[in-house]
């Protein structure tokens, strides 16, 4: 049999362990707040204005949907048939874009990273930056630098997306063979392999008003 001292010790051990056993898990940090939600979802549930978005949660829209998120002074917006997952980073947010269209507006001294098809887009300088990104296919992006230049990084290559331009960007993980000199009949030693092919598209139209951000 247990001695009174042994029983008392066992009881104390049980009481000490109770707070840990029944402790409420630490909630994930809030990333942002929904400012617009029409035919939209937060994770698998219908979204509405005022909902908090927590670390690692997904946002999405239906065919005619629209959704806006405020993350401090950063604004994000999705148009129809779009989806993304949000994460906190130092001074801003990281967006894992999965499909559709994304618009973002980021003031100076804030940080936005958009990860799409294994490419990473971010402001090229510490300044107000507004941009629109579309996933066209699993290898093609359309990027509009509405205000401020963007830096595009894909594997070990980088490109600057110039302000005021729209580009169609083809990403080739194996590298596309290209002539460096541009002359027909160049010998094989003058060929290089680039993983990023950029084509200039149409001019930019749109901004905060078009995307319904206030």
Region roles according to the model:
Residues 9-19:
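Bacterial N-terminal signal peptides
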Residues 1-8:
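Bacterial N-terminal signal peptides that target proteins for export
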Residues 4, 190-193:
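Short amphipathic, positively biased membrane-proximal segments
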Residues 24-190, 201-206, 210-211:
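Flexible, surface-exposed loop/linker segments and immediately adjacent secondary-structure boundaries
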Residues 193-199:
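Alpha-helical transmembrane segments of integral membrane proteins
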